[in-house]
């Protein structure tokens, strides 16, 4: 009988803790100062990306830090249903098929291969096969040791 009561008390305490934690978390993420609101910050970061030149990895194409920022802006645009931002991000990428083709990073290292997440995400959004064809080689070679690498 005492063992049963012990388990009941543990379950009740756990339930109370979970309920309190959820309520606190919801309140914590709902009370941002105006300038720190996630949507405001996301829009500012995305605008900043669109205003800057490409960040390059020496002479080997677009740097993975830009890829991560670009991907974050794209996911932000999707989650906030900002079709105009998706269009702007896509237009920036379109140049890589033609005028800025020399900025495509070579798939020689995990840092450069990160680039593949962008065309694959754009493929997921648009179903345009050009994005799939560009992104898959980066994904497929991400963990391969390049032929000219020193082990």
Model-derived features: where do they sit?
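Bacterial Sec-dependent N-terminal signal peptides
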Residues: 1-26
């Amino acid at each position: 009988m005492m063992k049963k009561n012990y388990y009941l008390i543990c379950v009740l305490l756990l339930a109370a803790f979970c309920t309190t934690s959820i309520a606190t978390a919801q309140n914590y993420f709902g009370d941002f100062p105006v300038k720190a609101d996630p949507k405001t910050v996301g829009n500012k970061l995305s605008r900043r990306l669109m205003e800057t030149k490409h960040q390059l990895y020496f002479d080997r194409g677009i740097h993975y830090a830009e890829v991560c920022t670009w991907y974050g802006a794209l996911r932000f645009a999707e989650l906030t249903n900002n079709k105009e931002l998706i269009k702007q991000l896509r237009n920036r990428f379109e140049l890589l098929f033609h005028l800025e083709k020399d900025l495509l990073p070579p798939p020689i290292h995990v840092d450069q291969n990160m680039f593949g997440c962008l065309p694959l995400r754009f493929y997921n959004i648009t179903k345009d096969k050009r994005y799939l064809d560009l992104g898959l080689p980066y994904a497929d070679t991400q963990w391969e040791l390049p032929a000219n690498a020193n082990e």
